[in-house]
Amino acid sequence: MDRKIVVLDINTANFFNTTKDLEVWKNFFNFIQANNHQLVFMSSCWQQAVLYLLDLLSLDDVDIIAESGAIIWISKTNEFIYQSFLDSVSIDTIVHHAIITNSGVFAIGKSKISEEPNTTINYFISLEKYKQFKLIWLTEFDQTLKYQNFLKNLSEMDVSSIYVFSPQYHLDFQLMEHISSGQPKFHYSNFYNENFLFTSTKNSKFSALETYVKSKNCSLKDVHYLNVTEVPINNINQLASVVFLSKKQPDNDEEFNNPEISIVLKGICEQLMK
């Protein structure tokens, strides 16, 4: 049995809404690792948010493709592999429009002045939005109270992604693209309610997956892809298998219940045995 790569494309905030029976998932993950296959969690969320979920599931040796492909994290070595960074014009445009719409900003990247491989900075004008954002993502960080301190910290890092928390949906994306010289070098996704992710146009989940697969001396035909209520990757026809698992089935309003999840996961396990 050849070694396979199993990719779980997941939004951490949605995961526990998909199934109430975590044992089904734990058994699936244990099967993958017991048979020496590589488990990868992919997400629009940042690495620490995914790592928190892995801790809850008591999972080790799981690599992460985070920020919609902006970064790859290798668990065994704690290595952060950045695909690209946002340019200064894009950063200024995104941050400016977030601030004037009273939105929260959470930026991630690599420090220019220290050996810190991955760092985060934030600016939330509203204490309420700061608390809401932390509650959604079950994350902890100190609120930056002075805007000048935030800008200073921002200038001292290469920014891989910017998350904007905008409950009022006041962001003017057309204006933002226009300000970026009519050729925006960033793309964005409304990856969760009231949450937006901005990354470089050089990034994509698929390109990050290609980079990761090559580093493992594997091919895309060794990849089994399971999407759980996330923005899907491109070129899925190049993968060994693809399964979409959501809380709602596409054809009706019935919930995708636990027995059906069990059947889906069992089917993937059978493919891995071939």
UniProtKB/Swiss-Prot annotation:
Keywords: ATP-binding, Nucleotide-binding. GO terms for molecular function: ATP binding. It comes from the Bacteria. ATP binds at residues 104-111. Pfam families: Hydrolase_3 (PF08282). SUPFAM superfamilies: HAD-like. This is Uncharacterized protein MG374. It comes from Mycoplasma genitalium (strain ATCC 33530 / DSM 19775 / NCTC 10195 / G37).
